[in-house]
Amino acid sequence: IQSLTLNGYSLTDPIGKKAEELKISLFLSLSPRQVIDVIHEEVEQIYRLKKIQFSSGGACCFVSLRDVFPNEESFIVVSVGSEVTDVVLVRNHTLATAFTFPKGSHSVYRTISESLSIDLQDAKTRALLCENGHASAEMIRTVSPLLLKARSEWVDMFSKSLSMYVNDLSIPHTVFVLAPNDLGCWYRDSIVNESFHQYTLTEKDFNVILVGSET
């Protein structure tokens, strides 16, 4: 249960209260039982944990940001993992909807790795050298176009995920980005440098906040 209101008023302890109208916001995350069982078995064999719990990454990000930024009623969470990106839409302190697309930080490195026929670690090293301004002219010449390609592919999928919310007519202005430290700025800039006006009511650029250890 994310929130509960009685007669339009939000309450944390509704027990014993009387009301004419009850509204409950409930978030459910589902997964096939066989998938859960396989993951549970693998984790148990390796780590020997007494208790293993499963939760939604998007929901965890939402709860954390809601507590850290209590004045932000509505916002978008972009959580970039190794293989996937979660996009969460929060409205009025409630997780409204979530979407996942198969592009994460490793997708960037694979684009370079496959194009240059090098291993993934080498591709990561070259990508970070270019992003940090320490690459040679030759490396910039070969890697920069591939980084642009990876950015274009990621932005395209992010744009498509936003288009799923257009019918709601109220895409939030604030975007929180959670990403691996080495590519955090890269993902933030990927959103900042693109135009998503067609998805917003205000026709303003997104206010993109990179969430890190200093936040």
Residue ranges and their predicted role:
Residues V88, C185-S190:
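A short acidic (Asp/Glu
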Residues Y109, S113-P172, A179:
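Gly/charged contiguous loops adjacent to phosphate- or pyrophosphate-bearing nucleotide/cofactor binding elements
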Residues L128, S195-T200:
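A common structural junction motif
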Residues R66-T97, I112:
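Gly/Thr-rich phosphate-binding beta-strand-loop-beta motif of the actin/hexokinase/Hsp70
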